[in-house]
Amino acid sequence: MKKFEFEYFILFLILLFSAFFRLFRLNLLLGFWYDQGRDALIIWDLLHYHKFFLIGPVTGIDGIFLGPFYYYLLAPFYFLGRGNPVIAAAGLSWLAVGAVFLLYFLGKKMFGTQVGLMAAFLYGFSYGQVTFSRWLANPNPLPFFTLLALFCLYEFIENHRSLFIVLSSFLVGLCLQLEAASAVFFLPSVIVILIWQRKRVSSIKYLVLGILVFVLTLLPQIYFNFRHDGILLSAFRKFLVEEKSFKLSFLQVVRLRLLTYYDVFAGKLFPQSGKLRLLVLALFSAPFVLFRKKCF
């Protein structure tokens, strides 16, 4: 078997088993609770009564809503399944399989075939990711669109293709509609990349267009806010100012975040064993120690 044939055979097996893990007995094990019922009713009204909407699911902050992208994304799956939530969940699971392929594609493009296959294998077979991918909820499609955004940023950095700044801005806007907390990752990352790689932007028009496209993804929420007497801004102001949500010091926040990231990252491979999680941390840190001169 030739090298490229073996590569694609391994990739096929990874994608096949990734799909199997995410779809097997989904009709029997799918969780359908209040949030899923609320979303299904809203999409039912869209499909049968043509009631369009400007906002999506509520966030973890009272009175603040996501954008409507998740509902419009689910609508075709509910239409094809005639209202069956299992079909909608299966559609999101296939997007998760698409994320496995994108990890392979990005890994191969950036670091080579072996890294691409290993990344796809770890993500596709991760217990945590498999469980997450079988969940009918708005954060579920986030990895797929995040990887698309990362691909656009990579094309901008490596191949000097300024148009991909516009595409990445649009995708980041969609990601924020799926999970507001992703802004903590996306906004600083994009700003740092734009400052760092500013000389690669062929024309200022791409930056302006990128900002306009990003704002365009926020227009439904902006219109909803002013249509309802500033309800979203009022809720955001209440969260930040009146309730004093950020009481911890900067060092306390950093410490808690690092512990959380460690727990989440290591838990994707070893959900329960503390000792094996330490092994993950050691393996992850080793390249930075061994190749610190090249890294920094």
Label each region the model flagged.
Residues 21-25, 37-65, 69-72, 76, ...:
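Extracytosolic helix-loop segments that constitute the early lumenal/periplasmic catalytic or substrate-binding loops
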Residues 40-49, 174, 183-291:
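Transmembrane-lumen/periplasm boundary regions of multi-pass, lipid-linked membrane glycan transferases
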Residues 15-18, 119-124, 172, 176:
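Short helix- or helix-capping micro-motifs
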Residues 128-141:
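Short acidic/glycine- and proline-prone juxtamembrane loop motifs at membrane-interface regions
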Residues 66, 70, 74, 78, ...:
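Transmembrane alpha-helices of multi-pass, membrane-embedded glycan-processing enzymes
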Residues 16, 90-110, 147-148, 152, ...:
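Transmembrane-helix motifs of polytopic, lipid-linked glycan transferases
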Residues 7-36, 210-227:
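Transmembrane signal-anchor helices characteristic of membrane glycosylation enzymes that use polyprenol
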Residues 1, 109-114, 149-167, 175:
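Membrane-interface transmembrane helices that cradle and orient dolichyl/undecaprenyl
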